[in-house]
Amino acid sequence: MANTQLKSDAIMDMMKEHLSTDAGKEVTEKIGLVYQINIAPKKLGFEEVTYIVDLKKGEVTKGKYEGGKVDATFSFKDDDFVKVATGKMNPQMAFIRGAMKIKGSLSAAQKFTPDIFPKPSKL
């Protein structure tokens, strides 16, 4: 079951495209951090898929980060990540409700806002 198809996979693909646009380049210049996002199909900590959202280089990759240490790590269930990425749930609310776990720099985590995702019209 490690090859589970996540709804988040499509969002990450769109994000990869988004970061190559002018709007995406603005995000990269503004934030300049590296985030690790762990997405679990059903339960946090189980069968998680790891994505690296590199807002220094403007890249999204699947798997572990090869460039040292990430600035912050976020863990979500698939459905909760989709809600945050599409603007249906605010990241702060997700954290308060326990739908998102954070490790790493708090100042880096505070820059994890809906602005980094493609606009909902594309989702």
Swiss-Prot record:
Keywords: Lipid transport, Peroxisome, Transport
Tissue: Expressed in most tissues including seedlings, cotyledons, inflorescence, leaves, stems, roots, siliques and flower buds, with the highest levels in floral tissues and in maturing seeds.
InterPro entries: SCP2_sterol-bd_dom (IPR003033), SCP2_sterol-bd_dom_sf (IPR036527)
Induction comment: Accumulates at higher levels in dark-grown seedlings. Induced by sucrose.
Principal location: other
Domain of life, per lineage: Eukaryota
Domain (SCP2) ranges: 16-113
Loss of function: phenotype: Altered seed morphology and delayed seed germination as well as inhibited root elongation in the dark; an exogenous carbon source is required to recover from the delayed seedling establishment. Reduced levels of glutamine, pyroglutamic acid, aspartate, beta-alanine, fumaric acid, glyceraldehyde and ribose, but increased accumulation of serine, glycine, asparagine, 3-cyanoalanine and 5-methylthiopentanitrile.
The UniProt record lists the keyword Magnesium: no
Span of the annotated motif Microbody targeting signal: 121-123
Entry's Gene Ontology BP terms: fatty acid beta-oxidation; glyoxylate metabolic process; intracellular lipid transport; response to absence of light; response to sucrose; seed germination; seed morphogenesis
Subcellular localization, as worded in the UniProt entry: Peroxisome
GO cellular component labels: peroxisome
Pfam families hit by this protein: SCP2 (PF02036)
Functional summary from the UniProt entry: Enhances the transfer of lipids between membranes in vitro. Active on phosphatidylcholine (PC), 1-palmitoyl 2-oleoyl phosphatidylcholine (POPC) and ergosterol, and, to a lower extent, dimyristoyl phosphatidic acid, stigmasterol, desmosterol, beta-sitosterol and steryl glucoside. Inactive or poorly active on palmitic acid, stearoyl-coenzyme A, cholesterol, glucosylceramide and ceramide. Required during seeds and seedlings development.
Protein name: Sterol carrier protein 2
